[in-house]
């Protein structure tokens, strides 16, 4: 027997076919959300308040500082927030200190800064009662970027950009005459040397001494019209502020505010880290020949001689000297924007491949401290040096799509950015109020207006592109949504502009972003999913774990390092399936490995790292596809995406053939209930589990406090499915931390269970499975195998109108008693009532407009008071196709203190209707390999083909769906599933390390089946065997959310569009089917004139004809001729609005008055014409 038995959770054992042992546990799959939010509360908020403090008034007398903050207790708990449509949030209170410098007085006060939304334990937010997820955003990292571009003459040119987190961009570029230009914040270009002069390098000689002599610099100096620092400052000021009179002081302050003011310019810690890394001498000197010795500035000793070529080992040796500023120079700048001296490191090297022995200077930024978040003059000089080095062939250009240059903004950072916007708006208000208020009586509370802060937070959660309504179709959808990475959103890309390169799979995605799971359609490649083992580091770069190889023994160690994409570029990484001996050494001399995106074979001594697991490449959803390695990637993509659309079934069942990922995905999704502490189960019932904590002190275990876990019962999920939790532990069980206590929807015994295991045959049957259609046995309908529960919510608001308040009542005008049979005394449907389409759920009446009353009515009104006022019914009825059983009714009253109701609403009634949907013809089904189809026929059980032992199969699939699609994984799953069913076991076949062909065939033989997995099938209708043996097995099939009940729709009479009077379209509007231009051609081709006429008139926009037709049908008369369609009148009005005089003439050239014609007049005129047997009026348009 291949494989070993592995325990998944408390209740499930699986035979696992993996050959590679797991060296690292999967991390908590939603920590990308929870960790980021924790960081925000712990550090992000304080950082924000520090950035903005102190706020000073224009005179500098008043100073306002934010000292500390605390979060209070939420007003409503989580469940209550959902029920009341409230936001789950806690009050944020900030300690504020006001210092009056004249008197030295200090006033401290705690100020309320609004309610701050809290994250739930499962990584979501409850906003206005709905669960939402904040998707992480993939953006370009702030840094220095160098690009290569080919100009129109085919010459290689370079450009460079310094991109901050916020602030002005700085760009360098060359032109056809080899002059180097700079652009400040996307304005017109200036010669590069102008900026250098403005920084304090006044003369040409100083600039040449600094950067080294080369022709590009000489050309640029020739082009440069300025001669000293002052002229350069004025030149820059004129470019940035054209039309304003330039002065040196203004120019200095402008340049300072653009680049060196921390409030205006921010590289962020990630930008500083990337800039230092890029401009550091280590990478730039690699493989270069020194033209001068490297000297230790502190001791004066020569570390490396002139003429040495620096390889990787040599650089590593002198790393400490480079870090301690070898060959550093300090420049005192006079008349510059910044008065501080500038320190740089410069080393001369020989230009590569140059016979004349020319040299160029490599300048480093001398490693500014990580606290320096602004750009420094040293950064600008070093980046210019890098640019000139590139022109000499030293250095590398950047790949923008490399994950070393793209980073994640997770919840915490997105919130922080939004909060910063709110605070900066508030800062303006505070400054204004400081100058108005009296300093004697002023308090921090009076200065602070919290509106802008609350508004920006509300806007972010309510309407940001990255704050999304959680996809709650099933636990996998929930989990994937929390791990989603989007390149769209504010500050990101747009669908229309995103190029092919951005969307493509990049080698740096390995182990960081899933290459499979991404939507089909316009968002392909822009929305991705985090790989299973990946995590996000402090700078927002995605890291993936690798096993370290000992450099001396070349054996795999237990040490696991997390590497970012640019760190990985320096190492050679072996595949996870490389063969190892018992000491952890590579068995083969040549090992398959990766280096910078090349898959090659290298000697085992060259290995630096090894993959942790074969599934580290793919995301959680993709890792749930068994035999993924046998599927084509396009189909695997569909398989991963369709699992997220599976509807939770009434009786879920975990797959016989899984991957071992089902348990982890279910546990971390947030749909299951997991133990927060180790403990013993004391009480279990359907809606609550009580666990007594077991605490260990000094080696002795004793009982602690009692934890209460409420279970959600038959709640409506975000996608209208049934959200129900079932306990799977018993009283007395000892549970560990994070163990599953209760299954959520689509879960069975602690494992994800999106579908059911059914017996499938690959065969055709009377052509019913043409084009991927699915033929199904009636047993699956009768036994509720694919029955799902759906809950829909309907609400009715009782408002105040101009004519008086609406009210809920049983007393409704013109409604029979039988129609009110389901309503209680209040006029609201009772719980448990079975309602059909069109039944009344809430009896509500609205006052009608009072028309001019006659004398008699006024008398009655005077005698009986209000009673004579008319009301019209505005009932809440069951929409089409939404009938079911009333599950719950909630009533919110303003009088009873429900402050969550919106203004003008006195009462709100919510009715929940539950439907049990059995599977139908027209429902969409799929497997896990992208094999999808629509049910075309449900065959009686007795007519289904049956196995030799008499068991009928459940589903027939078309064999033609397999070869062209190349998803062979489904065939292997089919055979292994049948063997597992016969053996009574569950199996796990992890991705890229699962059962191979031999394992599958040996398991089939072990189960006593034929080795080819085929069997004789008998036709259920005739009892004859089919001609050939057929592949029959067990496949895991899912029912998808695309159900025919939601799509099929028919209209008799319904609403019409206001202007054109044509029927509306779409199921939601109860619309009609559009009879379009091509359909009209078809009827014209047949010469079906009368059919065409009625389609274009009565059945469309002939308002008068519609009424007359209805009348004629009711009275049993002949249908009269049509009148003028409304669209013709609209056309006339359109032409008249263009200033054209349009008239309608009859055959005798008499004008037909169309403008003020009343509908009734038209009808009368038509009727007259018809009675006189006059020829039909002809319409012609004249100018």
Curated annotation (Swiss-Prot):
EC number(s) reported in the record: 2.7.7.6
Gene Ontology molecular function terms on file: DNA binding; DNA-directed RNA polymerase activity; ribonucleoside binding
GO cellular-component term (any): DNA-directed RNA polymerase complex
Gene3D superfamilies with a match to the protein in the record: 2.40.50.100, 2.40.50.150, 3.90.1100.10, DNA-directed RNA polymerase, subunit 2, domain 6 (2.40.270.10), RNA polymerase alpha subunit dimerisation domain (3.90.1800.10), RNA polymerase Rpb2, domain 2 (3.90.1110.10)
The reaction(s) this protein catalyses: RNA(n) + a ribonucleoside 5'-triphosphate = RNA(n+1) + diphosphate
Top-level taxonomic group: Bacteria
Keywords for the protein's UniProt record, in alphabetical order: DNA-directed RNA polymerase, Nucleotidyltransferase, Transcription, Transferase
CDD domains cross-referenced by the UniProt entry: RNA_pol_B_RPB2 (cd00653)
Pfam families: RNA_pol_Rpb2_1, RNA_pol_Rpb2_2, RNA_pol_Rpb2_3, RNA_pol_Rpb2_45, RNA_pol_Rpb2_6, RNA_pol_Rpb2_7
Any single GO BP term: DNA-templated transcription
PANTHER family tied to this protein: DNA-DIRECTED RNA POLYMERASE I SUBUNIT 2
Family annotation (HAMAP family): RNApol_bact_RpoB
Family: Belongs to the RNA polymerase beta chain family.
Subunit structure: The RNAP catalytic core consists of 2 alpha, 1 beta, 1 beta' and 1 omega subunit. When a sigma factor is associated with the core the holoenzyme is formed, which can initiate transcription.
Task performed by this protein: DNA-dependent RNA polymerase catalyzes the transcription of DNA into RNA using the four ribonucleoside triphosphates as substrates.
The protein's name: DNA-directed RNA polymerase subunit beta
Organism from which the protein derives: Staphylococcus aureus (strain COL)
Gene that this sequence comes from: rpoB
